[in-house]
Amino acid sequence: MAKLAVIRIRGRVNVKRPVRDTLAMLRLHRVNHCVIVDDTPSYLGMLQKAKDYITWGEINAETLAKLIRKRGRLIGNKPVTDEYVKEKLGMTIEEFAQKVVNGEMSLKDLPNLKPVFRLHPPRGGFRGSKKRSFKEGGALGYRGEKINELIERML
């Protein structure tokens, strides 16, 4: 089971109620926030409902490790460190990220980790309109493995 990275692209003005509720269930309350979800039919249905406000794709272990190391926060807004992960789980951030991507562990297995990653806007911009789908040269919707490039630019 793959893990999907979901990033909110568009803001909250004129969002229809069902879409707003779906974004709230995904914990995507603000622009440039990212969450990691499972590749299950229920989540895929939620992503399809909110596809005009988000982008998503399969995240790899290397990008997830960078995301946790650079943007991961613990309760109290403390950064996630190698020492903390080693103390709680007995492994490095890279090993933890690999197990999360493979489905052996979940992000919830790391105690006190906040589920939302707050990212910067991408360096170089979104390379097109924020209002069109990725297939049409925009920024929205499913983008597959290219989500890793976008996350790298947003770290």
Curated annotation (Swiss-Prot):
The UniProt entry, under SUPFAM superfamilies, shows: Ribosomal protein L30p/L7e (SSF55129)
User: Which InterPro entries does the UniProt record give?
Assistant: Ribo_uL30_ferredoxin-like_sf, Ribosomal_uL30, Ribosomal_uL30_arc, Ribosomal_uL30_CS, Ribosomal_uL30_euk_arc, Ribosomal_uL30_ferredoxin-like
Q: Please, one GO biological process term?
A: maturation of LSU-rRNA from tricistronic rRNA transcript (SSU-rRNA, 5.8S rRNA, LSU-rRNA)
> Which ranges of the sequence are coiled-coil?
none
Recorded superkingdom: Archaea
Q: Name one GO molecular function term.
A: structural constituent of ribosome
UniProtKB keywords: Ribonucleoprotein, Ribosomal protein
Alphabetical GO CC annotations of the entry are: cytosolic large ribosomal subunit
UniProt-listed Pfam families: Ribosomal_L30
Signal peptide (residue range): none
The family database entries (HAMAP family) matched by this protein are listed as: Ribosomal_uL30_A
Alphabetized NCBIfam families for the sequence: PRK06049.1, uL30_arch
Give the similarity note: Belongs to the universal ribosomal protein uL30 family.
Assembly and interactions?
Part of the 50S ribosomal subunit.
Query: What is the name attached to this protein's record?
Result: Large ribosomal subunit protein uL30
Q: What is the lineage of its organism?
A: Archaea, Methanobacteriati, Methanobacteriota, Thermococci, Thermococcales
